[in-house]
Amino acid sequence: MKGLNLYLINGMYWITASLYLPFITMYFSQKGMDSMQIGILSALLPIASLTVQPLWAALADRTGRRRRVLILLNLCCAAAVLLFPGTGSFGEILGAVTCYALFNSAVLPICDALVVSQAEEKGINFAWVRMCGTVSYAAIVLGMGFYLKKHMNLMFYGNSACFLLFTLLCLTLPKDKKTLKAQEQERRGPEADQTVKKAGKGPTFQSKEIYLILLFAFAMQFGINYYSAFLGVYLLELGYSQSLLGVLNCISALSEIPVLLLIHRLSRRYKQTVLLTAAVGCMALRLILLSAGNVALMAAAQLLQGPSYMVCYFVCVTYINRMVVPGKISQGQS
């Protein structure tokens, strides 16, 4: 099968995500954290995405060693997540989340940069590659939801093991090639440093339209972060357990499949701004349905995951890959 490693890499990344993102706030709540503390802990990953993630992306682009950087991040995540078992106080959990976020925040953009580029080179529809991640996420989150009620720490051990497997799969990506800037710097010696630095400070994208695209992405991320941060806590307050959380997250993942099957047709028919406007509207409706506190309406809200998050994610990733300045693909995706 052409590009099998790309399907496996994307699938394994979303398996690692399924063993952390859906259940972590429920873990915080069970450890006695209040809403304010959960909000602080949940904000660390987005903060790392704004501050640390661009540094990792710049390192990957300037050296051209994206695969090596991704492998390093995976190994660091595998080690950092093992800090969680045994934590009890807010300070201990804060330290574990901070350490994990420093590395985890940069994994997806660099992984996407590599996988999307390879998919285009091999003539593979990225929607099909991403669908492998969706199915993997749905299967794992459903099974783990029923098991984690009595074995909560298993999510951390499983996450660590999956990051190690993810690392092995990343070794199947083509070997890193030094960027033209790095080659030029080696050829010309230390005096080329200032030239390279000036070149690195240039624009990341070829069009200013990216700012409008990023505005939509910001609105979507605002909603999705709020949703993911407090859904688990909300279910606990209503008297439900991890099993329902797993079912709801499985529904949301499966709702992405029809979108991925149709996204190329939709992209050809409608402009990016039209699709993103509809996606943000679906996210707003999703939050309204969730607030009802009714399981049936919660399930309906989860069915909007595909029309909201997946549309926004796919449009942004593919648009950025087209409009990013050559040599800055990791920074663009970050």
Predicted regions and their residues:
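Juxtamembrane intracellular "pre-TM" segments in multi-pass secondary transporters
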Residues: 1, 173-219
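Helix-loop boundary and gating motifs at the non-cytosolic
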Residues: 1-46, 209-248
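Hydrophobic core of transmembrane alpha-helices in multi-pass small-molecule transporters
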Residues: 11, 80, 90-108, 114, ...
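Conserved MFS/SLC helix-loop-helix module at the cytosolic interface between two early adjacent transmembrane helices
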Residues: 51-88
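Helix-to-loop junctions at the C-terminal end of transmembrane segments
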Residues: 51-65, 147-148, 258-271
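Structural signature of the two symmetry-related core transmembrane helices
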Residues: 68-82, 274-289
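Intracellular juxtamembrane helix-capping segments at the cytosolic ends
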Residues: 105-120, 311-325
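Symmetry-related core transmembrane helices of the 12-TM Major Facilitator Superfamily/SLC fold
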Residues: 140, 155-172
